[in-house]
């Protein structure tokens, strides 16, 4: 299980949930909340499993769960992710806070309100970008994730 691309998987799950929430028809807008919460909780569970199976506590100063793929070789830019002790703590904090935010907004509007789909979809889009910011080991990739993170925050 240590060969799984855990960090990329943690980014794909909420993006998939966001896509499902975004394409819900207006008549099913009430499903946005449970789908968003389910997606966030699945991501949290995957984060806990990844930490338990792939992170060695004795070497928190080294990058672990490393994924590296060439992206723009002419510029020396790569899709490079990894976590150390601090970045893992920040990722786990984000994974806990997103379900809390979803639960906090659970009753803020009438059932099936028009803003539910957009709010929950954008919150789920924000999560993988936060994970990317905390896990990026390439400065260009960090910049891309940080700037991408600002888009759902703006709306």
Regions found by a protein language model. Give the residues of each.
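Transmembrane alpha-helical core residues of multi-pass small-molecule transporters
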Residues: 13, 17, 39-42, 97, ...
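Membrane-embedded alpha-helical segments in integral membrane proteins
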Residues: 17-22, 70-78, 126-140
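Transmembrane helix-loop-helix hairpins at membrane boundaries of multipass inner-membrane proteins
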Residues: 1-6, 23-121
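N-terminal signal-anchor/start-transfer transmembrane helix
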Residues: 9-27
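Alpha-helical transmembrane segments of multipass membrane proteins
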Residues: 18-23, 48, 99-102, 128-132, ...
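Hydrophobic core positions of alpha-helical segments in small-molecule transporters
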Residues: 9, 13, 35-38, 121-122, ...
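Alpha-helical multi-pass transmembrane bundles of energy-transducing inner-membrane proteins
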Residues: 27-29, 118-125, 129-155
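Short conserved micro-motifs on helix faces and helix-strand junctions that flank
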Residues: 11, 81-82, 95, 135, ...
């Amino acid at each position: 299980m240590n060969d799984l691309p855990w960090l990329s998987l943690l980014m794909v799950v909420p993006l998939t949930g966001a896509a499902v929430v975004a394409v819900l028809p207006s008549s099913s807008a009430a499903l946005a909340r449970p789908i968003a919460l389910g997606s966030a909780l699945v991501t949290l569970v995957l984060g806990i499993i990844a930490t338990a199976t792939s992170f060695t506590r004795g070497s928190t100063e080294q990058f672990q769960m490393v994924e590296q793929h060439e992206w723009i070789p002419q510029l020396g830019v790569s899709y490079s992710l990894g976590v150390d002790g601090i970045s893992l703590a920040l990722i786990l904090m984000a994974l806990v806070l997103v379900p809390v935010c979803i639960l906090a907004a659970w009753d803020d509007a009438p059932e099936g309100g028009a803003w539910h789909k957009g709010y929950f979809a954008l919150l789920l889009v924000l999560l993988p970008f936060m994970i990317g910011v905390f896990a990026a080991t390439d400065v260009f990739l960090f910049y891309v994730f940080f700037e991408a993170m600002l888009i759902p925050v703006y709306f």
